[in-house]
Amino acid sequence: MAETTPSRPNDTPENSPGGGDDNQSQSAGQSKNPASVKDRKCQYCHQAFTSSSLGRHLDQYLFKKKPDGVHDVEEIRRIRSGITRRQARTSSGKRDTPERAMGKGPSEHFAGGEYGAKPREGAIRMMFNTPTWHATGVINDIPNPGQTPEGSRFATSQSRTGVIHLPDYASRGASAKDPDTMRALELALREVLDNIKAATSRMRPRLSPFDFDIQSETFPSLCLRLLPPPPSLFSTNPFPSPSSFPLKPPGVEHLDIVRQAIRAKIDQWQSDQLSTQSANNSPGRPPLGLDANMISRSAQQHEDMSLRHLELAFKHWASLPPETRLEAWHLEITRAFAREVEKRKTLDEQLARVQQEANQLRAQVEKLGSCQWPREFALFPPDTLPLPPAVARELDAKESQISPGSPRWDYDSVVAKWKRVVMHDKSMGRVGVGYGNPPLDDRSSADTKARATEEPPASAALASTSTSAPPSAHPPPRALQPAPGPALAASPDQSSSHTGGASAPSSQNTSPYLRSPQAGPQAKRPRLMNGADGGHTSAANPSATAPNTWNPHSHQSLPGSNLASASGPPPSSGA
């Protein structure tokens, strides 16, 4: 059979719409063919090129070919640097723009300055995924050493606007947003308090005008505590002044001076109390519960009590003999010196702590100024750990293993250690340690107890069954054959000697999680449905007529059901 080859495809009818579309597409393709003809000429060598190949031809003399004396390299560089070059090959709509269509006209001639249009002034163009000239064959942004045209200025502005330099603080706190890091910081830095609030908090005024117990002082000790030292105390020949304490045992002339000093102390305390009470009346501060009348009454009480004690102390001092007064005066001077030594020691410790806090606050201010302070510390500044000067000197020792430069005090090391702890706790919580499934745990514990209670009756029943029936007459069903497990592999003699009745004890001693409900050897773990192994129950009791399903909530029905199934008649050979 000779068939003529049709002029069009067999699956396309002659008068179908698809055929018309094909003809239209072919005609459209034929109409576009003349657009790719070589309608351009090089103004130097007068060779014919297409509109795209002419640019590549001129670019050859800028980068690859050497000057041949025919093509003007400087003129070509000036022309090619001011044109708008095409971008990616996948961009659509570039070839059909009005500027492109106008450029294809026959009236356009290749001339210097007219080949490419200048970019629009004021327009900001962002180009992403710009291919290189190795991929497209078109070289962009050709520099011109002679002058600075519009194209180079546009390229410079484009490079400035295209690359966005993010500040360092934009990504500085990225690690603080990590939950593990935040938890590690919480464990590493346990104490976080508001240092700024503590530094600006006002102190409560003293409840007493004196910083000592005036009722326990003698007259010479009151003179040493309330009166100032003589101005000429450190001179060659010191002498007392009328308002200072004496260099010899005090007498009756110092009674009025001490009385005036007591009243001055109480008046100063009352003035401080009144100023504090007026400051508390400002809005935003909680009141201290003091008013002017209460302060005045308290000041009067302190004055009466202090003056009364002063009179009693002076009477006792005046009744002593001169030798006893001299010894008591020397003793009070020694006590005053010892008190000042203790006070100096306490003040030194407080000064060291204040200096440490000042250094920490200064470092915090520097970090805040340079935007290096973490966000968490801005909310909860860390507390200052008071370190005695002796401990600080030990830490600064060069040979010490606990110096600040030691790796054990490194921030990254401490945070990494606690981060490992946090991740470990999280992984353990996800796995289930401490968060186990209660129904599954109850199921396994109940099954273990049931198997422990039913082992002696089951073994006795199986022993009587094995003695009454020969092993060859009643082969065990396939579903009751023991699965290959660690217990059977350890005792192969027991499995080979008891072929008829060893399957039941092995199935009972084997955990239900290690047996398959299907026949044959175990391939994978059985799936528990609603906390019970239904396949195991049906396979272990093939001859039971009543449904003896295992209930996870009734633990007492397990031994009876298993004993009934174990002591039942073995399956007949004809089944």
Swiss-Prot record:
Residues 1-15, 22-34, 493-513, 538-558 have a biased composition (Polar residues). The keyword Transcription applies. Residues 455-471 have a biased composition (Low complexity). Residues 472-485 have a biased composition (Pro residues). Keywords: Coiled coil, Metal-binding, Nucleus, Transcription, Transcription regulation, Zinc, Zinc-finger. It comes from the Eukaryota. Residues 93-102, 440-454 have a biased composition (Basic and acidic residues). GO terms for molecular function: zinc ion binding. Signal peptide: none annotated. It is found in: Nucleus. A zinc finger (UBZ4-type) spans 39-66. Transcription factor required for normal voriconazole resistance. Contributes to the function of atrR and regulates the expression of the atrR target gene abcG1. Interacts with atrR. This is Transcription factor ncaA. It comes from Aspergillus fumigatus (strain ATCC MYA-4609 / CBS 101355 / FGSC A1100 / Af293). The gene is ncaA.
